[in-house]
């Protein structure tokens, strides 16, 4: 079947009332960004639907795939745009039925948005079904459990007919909910947390704490790859890589072993807080899960949060670990997350970290060294990368450079 349009249905935009125009415009911008590099199409965003007009050479499968990853889209259907005549609709219905298997069943489903159309829903179903049955003697009607369903939408401008409905990502268009800073560790949880807030229309930049030589270049490349996977959904994402070795070594030198994890997280939060203000973000996002590890008890969260007045969002707070793993697999980050390269959250882990840290004690331990100066140095030396969906890792860039130098 050669389709001439893609019909894009909005997600929760239908709930946005007077703000809908803003949301539709943002979604159209996101669609154009996602389809960059492809040709043979024109995007037409309307109040209640978006239509992608297709030229003969358009790659409909690739366009549909990319659209299915965009937040704010509920579903996509390849459609035929048909004149508002019974003859044109009947011809299109027969065209659909030509693809049906022998002895299969079908039904006609009609939605009549144009209430001024001269035929009602029942009449259209009867006439179109009759046209198909007259043309084929090896298929039959089954209105309850059909093998195929020819869907007909009668709209003001035209008739749209289709069979397939491809699920979209749902949620709200990224760019409608403000900006946050995602603390991206390299584990399973934080990429899922990032995806969850993006699904609510939030733009993210990511921060990663890198402690060479204790953490390797492979650990850094792993985080770049996780960011790249997230960028497939929303376009370029800035990744801020913090040189954290000095701070982490000093914490492990002067803080009581049971409190090093708490203090390390507090230092991370202080750095993140400074960066939040620099980039104009409204909140910090992390992948913490209540009770999962010692630093994620309520007592620990209280002690760690105390160093910032910036809201900290924890989308995975009440998830089971298995739920997080399932989501990680769904979004395509799981296999990268489980690569065995240690990050700064796993090195120097004490044997018996405190689960109910005493706030006064941790403040006392930190008072013996000038961490503010170290934090400022770390922020000043942040490496910022703009990660796109086709971003090459450091190793790939070096290999390509060597090849070019050789040639």
Curated annotation (Swiss-Prot):
List of residues binding ATP: 183-184, 208-209, 265, 287, 296
GO cellular component terms listed in the entry, alphabetical order: cytosol
E.C. code: 2.8.1.4
Reactions catalysed according to its record: [ThiI sulfur-carrier protein]-S-sulfanyl-L-cysteine + a uridine in tRNA + 2 reduced [2Fe-2S]-[ferredoxin] + ATP + H(+) = [ThiI sulfur-carrier protein]-L-cysteine + a 4-thiouridine in tRNA + 2 oxidized [2Fe-2S]-[ferredoxin] + AMP + diphosphate; [ThiS sulfur-carrier protein]-C-terminal Gly-Gly-AMP + S-sulfanyl-L-cysteinyl-[cysteine desulfurase] + AH2 = [ThiS sulfur-carrier protein]-C-terminal-Gly-aminoethanethioate + L-cysteinyl-[cysteine desulfurase] + A + AMP + 2 H(+)
Keyword Nucleotide-binding attributed: yes
Enzyme class, UniProt record, top EC level: transferase
Involved pathway(s): Cofactor biosynthesis; thiamine diphosphate biosynthesis
Database matches in Pfam families: ThiI, ThiI_fer, THUMP
Localisation per UniProt entry: Cytoplasm
GO biological process terms held by the UniProt record: thiamine biosynthetic process; thiamine diphosphate biosynthetic process; thiazole biosynthetic process; tRNA 4-thiouridine biosynthesis
Keywords of the record: ATP-binding, Cytoplasm, Nucleotide-binding, RNA-binding, Thiamine biosynthesis, Transferase, tRNA-binding
Xref: CDD domains: PPase_ThiI (cd01712), THUMP_ThiI (cd11716)
Single annotated GO MF: ATP binding
Limits of the THUMP domain: 61-165
Biological function: Catalyzes the ATP-dependent transfer of a sulfur to tRNA to produce 4-thiouridine in position 8 of tRNAs, which functions as a near-UV photosensor. Also catalyzes the transfer of sulfur to the sulfur carrier protein ThiS, forming ThiS-thiocarboxylate. This is a step in the synthesis of thiazole, in the thiamine biosynthesis pathway. The sulfur is donated as persulfide by IscS.
Stated family: Belongs to the ThiI family.
Protein name: Probable tRNA sulfurtransferase
Naturally occurring in which organism (per UniProt): Staphylococcus aureus (strain bovine RF122 / ET3-1)
This protein's encoding gene: thiI
